[in-house]
């Protein structure tokens, strides 16, 4: 079923609806002179030509004026003078069709604006009509009498007032609406005013101004609504942005906390205990797994407590005599080696259950110190010392901080090492040796100096360090130089020598605290196999970390030199190569 939007009547099909709408259209056709309605368009044309011949002549004049104003003659039949001023949908549509400049814009949604547009047009037409009647004064009385006798009293096109005679209507219009008739229409060359917003053409500037004011009022209302909507949208967008920022900050904070906790665990600063707690915990695990008898557990625990009490390493992870064994090996074998330089005597220390995963720096310091304790040149500064246990080394570093060494490094580790599993590196080894009056310095190989990320400058520096003694010596040179502390990201080792092969390639000899005693014991055999040295030899292709730092010992310090170096450590610097 289809429903008519005009009268509400329902019909069954689309053709019926079209026929129904045609009836509406015919009923809406009104004679502009006598208000006759209810006839077809052709009948209305015949009626106007016969009954209103003189008035129709005036209408044709109006159409010619409209043609001049709007530059078109396509819609002449819609420009009929609407004296009745009946504002309905069909009349408004006819008004819009008179303005081909922008017909779509003329039909605004606001009904007030439509009425003003129609009023403006009919105002102009009415002025022309009244002016023509003044010029044709000889016919005025005749026309008036014919109009009044045949079609009834005339109605004012401006206010709708009805007068009995046309002369009275003219008097009413000239007196009451004189302000609307102040423009002469003697010719068609009068100035025209285009509406800048919809294109409507007006002959009166004041009417155009009123018409534009209606546009502005409508636009102001729409803009106000837009501002309200825009303000709401901006507020919502701001709230969404704030929520997104809050979630992002929360996620970043959570990730930072997790990363910080991870770093704390990695570097032993998570308050999970130190050497003693880890040793006991790991021994208990061994007992629970059946790998250690309870009696062995108690014996080791007693030995550990005694070692911690006196601050001396119990020597259970130490392997001695390796330098001597290497000397014999290179003398009797290693035919591919042209020359080899070995450090002074040094013991190997490996990690235990108490420091596994974090104690490499402490074990390398034990190796370096074991060499210094066997060197007479350091008797004065290391008098009466033994190789300390790891907790004792932590205490010694804290004492160096208290003396004023490396305040920045102390701050990074919260001025505390005892009872933690905190890692130590080249800086801590340097300040510890300096506090003991051992002269040393740090060299930083901060980037690779060879192809494929290799460090040939590092190898050259170590070769110069060891070969500075005994130039032109035999194949095996046992120098008096202490071993070198070698640090890289995540691990540290001890360089105990360097060999030069017959093809002039260099290979470092390195003690790794991660290598257990049973492997190091293989080097003490009388007939050492070349494969046993594989764990010691490190070629240039084996050292490809981005950065390496070394701590090299150069002798003993006087008390004055120690004070000067303590002052220099306030802003820690190292020699950089390259």
From Swiss-Prot:
Name listed for the protein in its UniProt record: Zinc finger-containing ubiquitin peptidase 1
Marked site, Involved in the stabilization of negative charge on the oxyanion by the formation of the oxyanion hole, at 487
Instruction: Show the segment(s) annotated as zUBD/ZHA.
Output: 249-274
A GO molecular-function descriptor: zinc ion binding
Query: What lineage does the source organism belong to?
Result: Eukaryota, Metazoa, Chordata, Craniata, Vertebrata
Reaction(s) the record says it catalyses: Thiol-dependent hydrolysis of ester, thioester, amide, peptide and isopeptide bonds formed by the C-terminal Gly of ubiquitin (a 76-residue protein attached to proteins as an intracellular targeting signal)
- What does the subunit comment say? Interacts with RPA1 and RPA2.
Region described as MIU: spans on this chain: 226-248
The record's InterPro entries line, in alphabetical order, gives: UfSP1/2_DUB_cat, Zinc_finger/UBP_domain, Znf_C2H2_type
EC numbers: 3.4.19.12
Q: Which residues does the Swiss-Prot or TrEMBL record annotate as the active site? A: 360, 491, 512
What are the UniProt keywords, alphabetically? Acetylation, Cytoplasm, Hydrolase, Metal-binding, Nucleus, Repeat, Zinc, Zinc-finger
Where does the secretion signal sit in this chain? none
Keyword Metal-binding tagged: yes
The Swiss-Prot or TrEMBL record describes its family as follows: Belongs to the peptidase C78 family. ZUFSP subfamily.
Q: Which GO terms describe its cellular component?
A: cytoplasm; nucleus
**Role, per record:** Deubiquitinase with endodeubiquitinase activity that specifically interacts with and cleaves 'Lys-63'-linked long polyubiquitin chains. Shows only weak activity against 'Lys-11' and 'Lys-48'-linked chains. Plays an important role in genome stability pathways, functioning to prevent spontaneous DNA damage and also promote cellular survival in response to exogenous DNA damage. Modulates the ubiquitination status of replication protein A (RPA) complex proteins in response to replication stress.
**UniProt subcellular location:** Cytoplasm; Nucleus
First and last residues of each zinc finger (C2H2-type): 2-24, 29-52, 154-177, 193-215
Stored PROSITE patterns: ZINC_FINGER_C2H2_1, ZINC_FINGER_C2H2_2
Q: Which residues carry this modification: N6-acetyllysine?
A: 262
Q: Domain remarks in the entry?
A: The motif interacting with ubiquitin (MIU) and ZUFSP ubiquitin-binding domain (zUBD, also called ZUFSP helical arm ZHA) are responsible for binding the distal (outgoing) ubiquitin units S1 and S2 respectively.
